[in-house]
């Protein structure tokens, strides 16, 4: 459908409730997509012959204008793990709502989050609070990298 020209952007795919099944679709619809490696670590599993080591990579992709995807991949070589993670991130791409949700600013431009956002996974809890224009990103380095790829410029 994408190659035929029936679908011209990712918003149409999400509006229809369809899923992206191939990473090449995202590359075609978002040509200015940037890719950042968040983490690469060595993981091991115990087998009957000993330990089997592999590399696990976590990659974030985004266009700095409201689209963001995160993915993980494992392989025997670092490069292959990064490639698998990048493909997984393209398949997991989503739209990030942006706006001016800070009571201090009120400019109406999409530089921050429109409201306070909380996410929890395991024992980790992440809370993103909208910030006024010019504040910057007050977060850890990994969180800054992910928020920049999503197009968020100001938040706590």
What residue spans do the PLM features occupy?
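Ribosome-associated RNA-binding proteins
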Residues: 1-156
């Amino acid at each position: 459908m994408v190659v035929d020209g029936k679908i011209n952007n990712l918003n149409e795919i999400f509006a229809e409730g369809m899923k992206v099944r191939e990473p090449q679709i995202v590359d075609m619809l978002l040509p200015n997509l940037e890719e950042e490696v968040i983490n690469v670590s060595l993981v091991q599993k115990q087998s009957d012959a000993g330990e089997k080591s592999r590399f696990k990579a976590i990659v974030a992709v985004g266009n700095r204008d409201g689209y963001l995807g995160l993915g993980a991949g494992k392989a025997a070589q670092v490069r292959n793990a990064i490639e698998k993670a990048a493909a997984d991130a393209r398949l997991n791409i989503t739209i990030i709502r942006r706006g001016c949700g800070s009571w201090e600013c009120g400019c109406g431009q999409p530089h921050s989050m429109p409201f306070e956002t909380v996410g929890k996974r395991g024992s980790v809890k992440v809370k993103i609070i909208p910030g006024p224009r010019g504040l910057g990103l007050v977060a850890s380095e990994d969180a800054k990298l992910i928020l920049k790829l999503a197009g968020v410029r100001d938040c706590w």
